[in-house]
Amino acid sequence: MLSTRFLNKVLKGAFFNIQIMVKYKIDFILFLMEREMSKKTAKKKNVMVEENKVDKLLTTVFGDPQKKVLRRLQRKVDEINNLSEKYKKMSDEKLKEAFKKLKKSLSKKDLDDILPDVFALVREASTRVLGMRHFDVQLIGGMVLHEGKVAEMKTGEGKTLVATLPVSLNAMEGRGVHVVTVNDYLAQRDASWMGNLYDFLGLSVGVIINEASFIFDPEYDNEEHEDENMRKLRPATRKEAYAADITYGTN
């Protein structure tokens, strides 16, 4: 008959062997996983290298697409700058009349045709009404937005002012332009702040927020409002605000 001590030794030995086998299998599985991951990483690196080669080849043959876009936009900036003196010499009334004439010219032209004139005119109007003149880089930002692309700008780089360029241009078609901001306060602030410029150009401005809607009215004065700029926002129906040439709202 087998002793208890002998059986314990046998069981311990068997358990020890099982541990070794399990550890060996786990180590082997980990080895296979690492090898597979290394292969995938190598493949990705090879793909990236090949893509870089293709990009370099395309750039060599066709040129850097981003630089091409910037060169094209810079030519427009130069054209706008050349027109600046023309609008600078005009009186306020002449400037307003020039905006109306450009608007009427859309029956024979498209927006891209009149963009340089409109941008130059709006920049001059902004200088007079708001005391702010668009920089060249802001003109580029305005053109990028007009083309339906995304213009990335940091806080303080003048997004609100930049928007006045494509907004004024596209509002000339009379189909309504919507400007979307991130909250109710900014929608009201930007509409009030830029409303003076749009009003100078003969464009109406509406605001639609969660619980109210307004029309920018230079003759209206809500003395109860702490922000002096927002005092010109007259309560209106949502329909009236939507019918404005330019409507500010939130996302």
Where are these regions (language model features)?
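Conserved motor-coupling elements within RecA-like helicase/translocase cores
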Residues: 211-247
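Conserved RecA-like helicase motor-core motifs
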Residues: 202-212
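Charged, compositionally biased N-terminal leader segments and the immediate start
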Residues: 34-83
